[in-house]
């Protein structure tokens, strides 16, 4: 199985100026996934506008994998506390913007 961080769509996401961090969570982060398990991503983009998030979703929708990708936006208050806690418990940081 290909390393999640090596997918081209992850590289494209990292190039977006408003993306601060990309986290893998869920079964793939825990290592108890099946071959066809989905990819769960949490993307922190504190300063992104809704139109910026649409760019993220376009990249995800056109990803270089046939696996299903579930993507949640961090930095919005819409996540339930339970989901956020599960993300924090499982998270593997795939990318973190270098702060100057």
Regions found by a protein language model. Name each.
Residues 1-21, 29-35, 46-100:
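Catalytic core of pol beta-like nucleotidyltransferases
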Residues 40-42:
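Short, well-ordered beta-strand segments
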């Amino acid at each position: 199985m290909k390393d999640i961080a090596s997918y081209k769509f992850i590289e494209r996401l990292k190039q977006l100026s408003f993306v601060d961090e990309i986290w893998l969570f869920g079964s793939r982060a825990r290592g108890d996934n099946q071959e066809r398990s989905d990819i769960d991503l949490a993307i922190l983009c504190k300063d992104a506008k809704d139109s910026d998030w649409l760019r993220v979703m376009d990249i995800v929708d056109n990803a270089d994998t046939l696996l299903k990708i579930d993507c949640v936006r961090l930095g919005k208050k819409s996540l339930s506390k339970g989901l956020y806690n599960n993300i924090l418990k499982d998270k593997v940081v795939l990318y973190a913007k270098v702060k100057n």
